[in-house]
């Protein structure tokens, strides 16, 4: 008698489990599943994500790179010394370069030469997403500007469109330039663009961005702008904040407390 398709699938599944030396209800499998559950919490969701950088607090720790190291090690960002081929998700720029429109002759001298953290601004009106021919970069409903490295064809239109220099192009295979690869996050290949994604993969696991967790002085605050009770809203309502190149109309979602 011919075996029906449903019965065949059942038999195939049982055979596969037997060959694997266990069953779905085996103690080892259950323990492994429990360990996985411990690692993944409830996703952190928001309507409009934003980052607040406290420049005063950050300036107290001169030379600190904890957030940069955490971000780059978490996301397998290669350490390439050649400036023209450097890949970076979060880095430091002089205040005068990061905020050219905030300059005036009476600006505090130490602030003019101070280095500030910069990364993708996850603009509310991102020019990068409009020029991508393959939709490899797009803005989610919660405001995060994403990247799909498998769809990226390396045209670099988005790099040219970004007025903040927040996107890096892999001119070479980045893998040899990663000291220790994080197996939990994909590496990229030569010929694709990459950038900060506000740690979307960590938010999905119920974790805050790596840079925020790494900052021991709480200089970085991440939260939902549309939540009146969020810390980012409280800080922005209490203190004066600036955004990079506001005249461009991109509406950055990274705010700097000065």
Identify the residue ranges that each predicted region occupies.
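N-terminal secretory signal peptides and thylakoid transit peptides that target proteins
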Residues: 1-19
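C-terminal segment of N-terminal export signals and the immediately downstream linker at the start
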Residues: 22-60, 247-258
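Short, cationic motifs built from Arg/Lys/His that form the positively charged side of catalytic pockets
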Residues: 5-6, 158, 219
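Ferredoxin-like iron-sulfur electron-transfer modules
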Residues: 42-63, 103-209, 213
């Amino acid at each position: 008698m011919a075996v029906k398709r449903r019965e065949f699938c059942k038999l195939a599944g049982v055979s596969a489990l037997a060959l694997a030396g266990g069953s779905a209800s085996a103690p080892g499998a259950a323990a492994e599943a429990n360990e996985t559950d411990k690692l993944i919490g409830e996703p952190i969701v928001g309507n409009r994500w934003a980052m607040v950088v406290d420049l005063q607090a950050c300036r107290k720790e001169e030379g600190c790179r904890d957030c940069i190291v955490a971000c780059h090690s978490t996301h397998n960002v290669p350490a390439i010394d050649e400036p023209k081929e450097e890949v970076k998700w979060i880095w430091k720029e002089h205040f005068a370069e990061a905020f050219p429109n905030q300059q005036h002759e009476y600006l505090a001298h130490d602030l003019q030469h101070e280095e500030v953290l910069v990364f993708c601004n996850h603009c509310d009106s991102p020019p990068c997403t409009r020029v991508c021919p393959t939709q490899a970069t797009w803005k989610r409903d919660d405001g995060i500007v994403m990247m799909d490295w498998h769809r990226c064809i390396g045209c670099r239109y988005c790099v040219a469109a970004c007025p903040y220099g927040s996107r890096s192009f892999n001119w070479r295979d980045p893998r040899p330039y990663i000291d220790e690869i994080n197996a939990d996050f994909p590496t990229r290949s030569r010929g694709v663009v990459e950038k900060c994604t506000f740690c979307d993969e960590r938010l999905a696991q119920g974790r805050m961005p790596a840079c925020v967790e790494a900052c021991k002085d709480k200089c970085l605050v991440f939260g939902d702008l549309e939540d009146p009770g969020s810390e980012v809203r409280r800080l922005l309502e209490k203190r004066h904040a600036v955004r990079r190149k506001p005249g461009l109309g991109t509406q950055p979602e990274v705010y700097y407390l000065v």
